[in-house]
Curated annotation (Swiss-Prot):
It comes from Rattus norvegicus (Rat). This is Glutathione S-transferase Mu 2. Conjugation of reduced glutathione to a wide number of exogenous and endogenous hydrophobic electrophiles. Participates in the formation of novel hepoxilin regioisomers. It is found in: Cytoplasm. The gene is Gstm2. Substrate binds at residue 116. Belongs to the GST superfamily. Mu family. Its main location: cytoplasm. The keyword Membrane does not apply. Its EC number is 2.5.1.18.
Length: 218
């Protein structure tokens, strides 16, 4: 029975999950909910189902896999990672995965706070000023390894790819000083399942954020 992934019809917090499902050749329904336009941003399409799905903490994204009903994007990825043994194999690798999962979420939220701010035009230069230091930390953490936990891909690589790619869209030159991060992105996009997905009609790279964001390339 196929899994069901529910989320808005945007990239957002579901991108890494969709990439992981495609990479692992998982059968799933990508259930997308639409949001209305300004000024109301009507969410009735989701709200009409929100409390009828049996979710403990009803929210988007959600994943339903048989009797397992999961919310919180990182919990979903971790669940999928365990199913496919892509969570790190040694304690050192698992520590790296745990640290990076949270670091990537911090970076994602920092960018989102800027992009959703009514004061976007003032906050953008401030954010860009601190961006090289953020990217430097990711570059140093990756080092010469092909993947962030080591020699084998883990679910956290899907998260970090998403975060790096969002920043590459936000500031196209942000990875230029970090060849290993550029190589990582190219390596990830070169994976056959990922490459095939990105060329398919199912692939959704934009919009990144919901309609109320002040920066949201279409």
């Amino acid at each position: 029975m196929p899994m069901t992934l529910g989320y808005w019809d945007i990239r957002g917090l579901a991108h890494a999950i969709r990439l992981f499902l495609e990479y692992t050749d998982t059968s799933y329904e990508d259930k997308k909910y639409s949001m209305g336009d300004a000024p109301d941003y009507d969410r009735s399409q989701w709200l009409s189902e929100k409390f009828k799905l049996g979710l403990d903490f009803p929210n988007l994204p959600y994943l339903i896999d048989g009797s397992h009903k999961i919310t919180q994007s990182n919990a979903i990825l971790r669940y999928l990672g365990r199913k496919h043994n892509l969570c790190g194999e040694t304690e050192e690798e698992r520590i790296r995965v745990d640290v990076l999962e949270n670091q990537a979420m911090d970076t994602r939220l920092q960018l989102a706070m800027v992009c959703y701010s009514p004061d976007f035009e003032r906050k953008k230069p401030e954010y860009l000023e601190g961006l090289p230091e953020k990217m430097k930390l990711y570059s140093e953490f990756l080092g010469k390894q092909p993947w962030f936990a080591g020699n084998k891909i883990t679910y956290v690589d899907f998260l970090v790819y998403d975060v790096l790619d969002q920043h590459r869209i936000f500031e196209p030159k942000c990875l230029d000083a970090f060849p290993n991060l550029k190589d990582f992105v190219a390596r990830f996009e070169g994976l056959k399942k990922i490459s095939d997905y990105m060329k398919s009609g199912r692939f959704l790279s934009k919009p990144i954020f919901a309609k109320m964001a002040f920066w949201n390339p279409k």
